[in-house]
UniProtKB/Swiss-Prot annotation:
Active site: E119 (proton donor/acceptor)
Entry protein name: Metallothiol transferase FosB
PROSITE patterns: VOC
Compartments, record wording: Cytoplasm
Binding site for Mg(2+): H11, H70, E119
Any GO molecular function: magnesium ion binding
Free-text function comment from the UniProt entry: Metallothiol transferase which confers resistance to fosfomycin by catalyzing the addition of a thiol cofactor to fosfomycin. L-cysteine is probably the physiological thiol donor.
BP GO annotations: response to antibiotic
Family listed: Belongs to the fosfomycin resistance protein family. FosB subfamily.
Length: 154
């Protein structure tokens, strides 16, 4: 293994206003498995991703709704109807997606009880790069970095 390299995402931590509400949301929506719960913190396993929550009741949360910042999880195209139904049945706040070209692939956007945004996306970075290279040649592409990314994921 090479030294001095980022190895991947270690964990995702969210500030939440009500720990018990967030625990219920992530268990029901994502089928996340809780590992440890305390008075103001909880750790979950989400299919190998370490999720952490810290309850912070007095944080202003209104501004988060104006941002496009989000976390996207990959899903299969054929699973899109399942997720649409599940989110609807659970009463999850599903957000209006942005207009997109079919080359961007399909997505569902939604938020948790504190306004953290998520996307369930059917494409990959490789799909997006191919679409951009074919349809948006005016963009700048770093061919060396793109090749290295492809090579790492063969």
């Amino acid at each position: 293994m090479e030294n001095n390299k980022i190895l991947g995402i270690n964990h995702l931590l969210f500030s939440v206003s009500d720990l018990s509400v967030s625990i219920s949301f992530y268990e029901k929506v994502f089928d996340a498995k809780w590992l440890v719960k305390a008075e103001k913190t909880a750790y979950f396993d989400l299919n190998g991703i370490w999720l952490a929550f810290n309850e912070e009741k007095d944080i202003k949360r209104q501004e988060i709704h104006d941002s496009y910042t989000h976390i996207a999880f990959s899903i299969q195209q054929e699973d899109l109807p399942f997720w649409e139904k599940k989110l609807h049945d659970l009463g999850v706040n599903v957000l209006k997606g942005r207009k997109r070209h079919e080359g961007d692939r399909d997505s569902i956007y939604f938020s948790d009880p504190d306004g953290h945004k998520f996307e369930l996306h059917t494409g990959s970075v490789f799909d997006r790069l191919q679409y951009y290279q074919n349809e948006k040649p005016h963009l700048s592409f770093h061919e060396g970095h793109i090749k290295a990314l492809y090579d790492r994921n063969k």
